[in-house]
């Protein structure tokens, strides 16, 4: 299995970083897009990935840097001449909200009929705390607090990836606040962690900040690659015990996951 970062930046990133979306390539060659932000058509092109090569999409939460490109992807594949519906994996309530709050306005009326999400995607609503199998890879959803308070909470669903007969080898946090206890527990199961990391001078409180992640035990930090950061960071992750900042376009290979 391979994981390639189409981008490594935040909501406000430009072409030098792109949004923090990824492509997972299974041993079979099938590709799954992990989140689909507003700039995905450009980041895919830069990585020489044709949208028609994508087999599935996983959505972690509804911010535009994670779903803003889905309307484009839905129309691109629907009218692409191959009559192809991508598999769509996301938590069940999130899947309903994705259609009614994010996509319906642009995708319902296309001059043929009143369209539904299932006209564009082969939908797989997932139970909270559940998981799914894709191309022989087992994925487990991990509920992460992202924007909390004020009577309106937003969670993002991270992914643990592995195989049925082996320990989980990979964790992708997606967008999350700092959760030290949870990350320490996950580090006992995962050989490698890709973690949301804010590096701005002003802490937003909705993303784990570098200075918070710095307090994790060395045995956890040495498993962590940092992404979703701001440009021109003053921090030196290698010196601080992390594996580093993921670079735009960087690819990781996992030989123990098919």
Predicted regions and their residues:
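Active-site neighborhood of phospho(di)ester-bond hydrolases with catalytic His/Asp-centered motifs
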Residues: 33-37, 55-65, 91, 171-176, ...
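Active-site metal-binding motif and surrounding structural segment of the metallo-beta-lactamase
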Residues: 39-89, 189-192
């Amino acid at each position: 299995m391979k994981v390639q970062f189409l981008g490594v930046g935040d909501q406000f990133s430009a072409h030098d970083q792109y949004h923090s979306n990824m492509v997972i390539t299974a041993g079979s060659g099938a590709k799954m897009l992990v989140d689909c932000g507003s700039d995905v058509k450009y980041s895919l092109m830069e990585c020489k990935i044709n949208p028609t090569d994508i087999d599935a999409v996983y959505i972690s939460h509804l911010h535009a840097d994670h779903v803003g490109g889905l309307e484009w992807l839905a129309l691109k594949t629907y009218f692409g001449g191959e009559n192809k519906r991508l598999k769509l994996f996301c938590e069940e309530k999130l899947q309903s909200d994705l259609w009614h709050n994010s996509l319906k306005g642009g995708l319902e009326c296309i001059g043929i009929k009143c369209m539904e999400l299932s006209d564009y995607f082969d939908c797989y609503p997932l139970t909270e705390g559940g998981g799914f199998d894709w191309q022989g890879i087992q994925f487990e959803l991990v509920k992460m607090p992202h924007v909390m308070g004020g009577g309106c909470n937003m969670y993002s669903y991270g992914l643990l990836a592995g195989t049925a007969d082996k320990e989980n080898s990979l964790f992708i946090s997606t967008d999350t606040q700092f959760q030290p206890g949870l990350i320490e527990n996950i580090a006992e199961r995962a050989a490698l962690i890709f973690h949301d990391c804010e590096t701005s001078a002003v802490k937003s409180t909705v993303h784990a900040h570098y200075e918070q992640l710095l307090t994790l035990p060395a045995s956890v930090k040495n498993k962590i690659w940092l992404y979703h950061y701001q440009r021109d960071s003053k921090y030196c992750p290698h010196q601080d015990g992390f594996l580093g900042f993921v670079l735009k376009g960087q690819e990781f290979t996992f030989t123990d996951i098919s």
